[in-house]
Regions:
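Aromatic/His-enriched, Gly/Pro-containing loop or helix-boundary segments
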Residues: 92-106, 200, 206-215, 397-398
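Substrate-binding groove of N-acetylhexosamine-processing glycoside hydrolases
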Residues: 2-25, 29-32, 39-42, 66-68, ...
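A generic structural signal for short coil/turn motifs at secondary-structure boundaries
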Residues: 36-38, 115, 166-167, 298, ...
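Substrate-binding cleft of carbohydrate-active enzyme catalytic domains
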Residues: 152-338, 349-350, 356-358, 367, ...
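Contiguous, structured surface segment used for ligand recognition
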Residues: 2-155, 406, 413, 418, ...
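A structural preference for short, hydrophobic beta-strand core positions in alpha/beta folds
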Residues: 59-61, 231, 336, 383
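N-terminal small/glycine-rich loop or linker at the start of catalytic domains
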Residues: 144-162, 251, 382-391
């Protein structure tokens, strides 16, 4: 039997003998009564056939049952099925209840293909599956019958657009095209400040904010592809981008300027204004108000409320109820993250019946107890795993595989209705977006199948479908890069020390000396894996259909290799200084000074390519944050070289070297998570 690698894997696929040859006689046939959605899906299919075979199939509408062969029928709903006299087996959707809404049948026979669904969304998904068959088999499609439906009704992606990087409109549309092709049906853009609020223009100024017309355009683009663009506006903690502005400082709970204080009535005036500026542009009935990680709640302005209401949890819940009211004025129900409820479990039972709970964890654990604890209350539970791309130069794929699969499985067991895969941008969003395609599509696949897709089956399908030509070599490079995160000493919680090694101080950084220092063997292996991957991606990227993604992989690989060299050099310099005696400075010191200068020049080249790749997908936004890491690291390399030159001179003059680096000052060099919280 031939293995058919489709993503997501269909629930029920039966191969039959023979195949369907696509030829010039073929047309795409719609019932006369079909609407815009069928016409859109038909054009998507035609584009795919044209790309794969060079044939442009006509799209026609017919009143009566069409001829039995040379036709691809797109049929939506029982009335159209009757008009086209469909065989009963071709309209048998085995799905029940809510899942029927997105179910479809795809029957490929000799000379004829039938796509049937009850709804436009189901028909759109049938077309996506057929597009994959065309991509893989071109003009000879294997005969089969597929009956398919999703395990989870809502399958979404949350993309962080507030940690200093806002994608261009073209990038967002490309993202929506890709996500909807793999049957994702929800998109949230995580927003702290990156929206142009007419009533508070300074909040979103100068950071690449999306405007209201951008939202109208994206909302329509999403609806056409059966994606719900859900508004997302952080409404409690994570408010530093607002609270740093002088005119809003009085709203802060504490001097940390992190949480909007529920003790200040102006907090609710502000949120009411922001909701009024933003929510009317979204057709979705649901707003994610976030409200996670309110670290300092109850420790400042609201401390009296804590005594009055009987605990921080009660203060938290009262705020949630107030934002729920504000959202309701705009006809929206709310979603909230569940972490604060898990910290105050006594609140869970009192969650109102129209509030959706989001259980998040990015941990590659076998079980996530929060999923069960948050189930059975409110308006339904969504599970929220992550792509593992943030706090890392390349995504922590092996962790993301386990995290996504297990969160979805536990969600299914707990009766969850949705999955929201997350792609965060902590500390400057320096990781390239294209590195997350694997994680985005993995989330879509597991959400559809209920977490039953194996890693091997996923990769076997993802390579050919996403990368196309040269996919075996590209997937091998992807594995090599993923493996750099699994080497001894590299993993932290939700982060990877490859990126710390890149931006750390070259002589006293955490990855160079001390408990967090990376072992020499790890650094050698890191350099070897990354160099091999870089060579593959650089060789294959020109003219490839995924050229940009391959350049992003090469850039990440080059940065990982550079980080390994830099850290190993720092460790060698420290070792040299410990063993030199006054008198003749060893020649290796000269080599090490030159090597630091060479690394500084190399870092400039890496930054240049990194910056080009940022602009290829994103607005300028707040690129200065990540550029600051490159600039200060470059400065540290120069300072280290100059300081080492002083040690060389001291040795030549018969003095001792400063083996303990007491005269080397790096205390003001703080990068990444050393600048917590973000």
């Amino acid at each position: 039997t031939m293995a058919l690698h489709l993503l997501p894997e269909p629930k029920d696929l039966m191969l039959v003998k023979g195949m369907c040859a696509l030829d010039q006689e073929m047309s795409i046939v719609l019932p006369a009564a079909s609407g815009d959605a069928s016409w859109f899906a038909a054009r998507e299919l035609r584009k795919e056939v044209l790309r794969a075979t060079g044939m442009a199939l006509p799209i026609v509408k017919e009143q009566a049952p069409p001829r039995p062969d040379h036709a691809i029928l797109l049929v939506c709903g029982p009335e159209q099925a009757e008009a086209f006299a469909l065989d009963p087996s071709h309209k048998r959707l085995d799905a029940a209840g809510e899942q029927r809404e997105q179910a479809y049948v795809l029957a490929v026979q000799r000379g004829r293909i039938v796509l049937y669904a009850d709804t436009p969304a189901g028909l759109f998904y049938a077309v996506q599956t057929l597009r994959q068959l065309v991509r893989l088999h071109r003009d000879h499609i294997p005969a089969l019958i597929i009956r398919d439906w999703p395990s989870l009704e809502a399958r979404g992606l949350l993309l962080d657009i507030s940690r200093r990087k806002v994608p261009t409109m073209d990038t967002l549309k490309h993202l929506i095209d890709e996500l909807s092709h793999y049957k994702l049906n929800v998109l949230q853009l995580y927003t702290e400040h990156t929206f142009a609020f007419p009533s508070h223009p300074r909040i979103g100024a100068g950071c690449g904010s999306l405007g209201s017309e951008d939202i109208l355009e994206l909302d329509a683009y999403c609806r056409q592809r059966h994606v719900e663009l859900m508004p997302n506006l952080q409404s409690f903690g994570h408010a530093r981008n607002i609270l740093r502005l002088p005119e809003y400082r009085h709203l802060a709970e504490t001097g940390l300027r992190w949480t909007l204080s529920p003790a200040v009535e102006d907090t609710y005036t502000l949120l009411g204004d922001l909701y009024g500026d933003m929510l009317p542009f979204f057709s979705s009935p649901t707003l994610n108000v976030d409200c996670d990680e309110t670290y300092d709640l109850g420790q400042g302005a609201s401390s009296a409320m804590v005594d009055e209401l009987g605990g921080v949890g009660q203060v938290y819940m009262q705020h949630v109820l107030r934002v729920r009211e504000l959202a309701a004025r705009h006809g929206k129900r709310i979603q909230i993250w569940g972490d604060m409820l898990l910290n105050h479990p006594e609140l869970i039972a009192g969650v109102p019946g129209d509030v959706m709970l989001l259980a998040w964890s990015y941990d590659p654990a076998e079980s996530h107890p929060g999923v069960g604890e948050l189930s059975g209350v409110g308006a339904g539970l969504w599970v929220c795993p992550g792509t593992g791309s943030w706090n890392s130069l390349f995504p922590r794929i092996s962790g993301a595989r386990v995290n996504i699969r297990n969160m979805v499985r536990e969600g299914m067991a707990a009766g969850a209705v949705g999955m929201l895969n997350t792609d965060w941008g902590d500390f400057g969003h320096y990781q390239h977006m294209g590195l997350s395609w694997h994680g985005y599509i993995l989330g879509a696949a597991q959400g559809w199948t209920g977490g039953t897709t194996s890693d091997e089956a996923f990769d076997a399908a993802f390579g050919p479908l996403f990368f196309g030509e040269e996919h075996p070599a590209i997937m091998e490079a992807l594995d090599l890069l993923a493996h750099t995160n699994d080497l001894p000493g590299v993993q932290g919680i939700n982060r990877s020390n490859t990126v710390l090694a890149l931006f750390d101080d070259p002589l006293v950084g955490e990855t160079v000396e001390g408990d967090e220092a990376l072992p020499a063997e790890t650094l050698r292996e890191m350099h070897s894996l990354a160099s091999q991957a870089a060579a593959t991606c650089e060789a294959l990227s020109p003219e490839h259909q995924r050229e940009l993604t391959l350049r992003e992989m090469a850039s990440a690989a080059d940065m990982i290799a550079h980080a390994a060299l830099k850290t190993a050099l720092g460790q060698r310099i420290r070792a040299t200084l410990r063993k030199v005696a006054p008198g003749e400075p060893p020649s290796e010191l000269d080599e090490q000074i030159l090597a630091l200068d060479k690394l500084a020049a190399g870092l400039e080249g890496l930054r240049e390519e990194w910056e080009l790749l940022w602009h290829a997908r994103a607005r300028i936004s707040e690129i200065h944050v990540a550029l600051g890491f490159f600039a200060s690291t470059h400065t540290r390399l120069r300072i280290a070289a100059a300081w080492l030159e002083e040690q060389r001179r001291a040795l030549a003059a018969g003095e001792s070297a400063d083996a303990e680096l007491e005269t080397y000052n790096a205390s003001d060099h703080r990068v990444l998570w050393q600048i917590w919280p973000d």
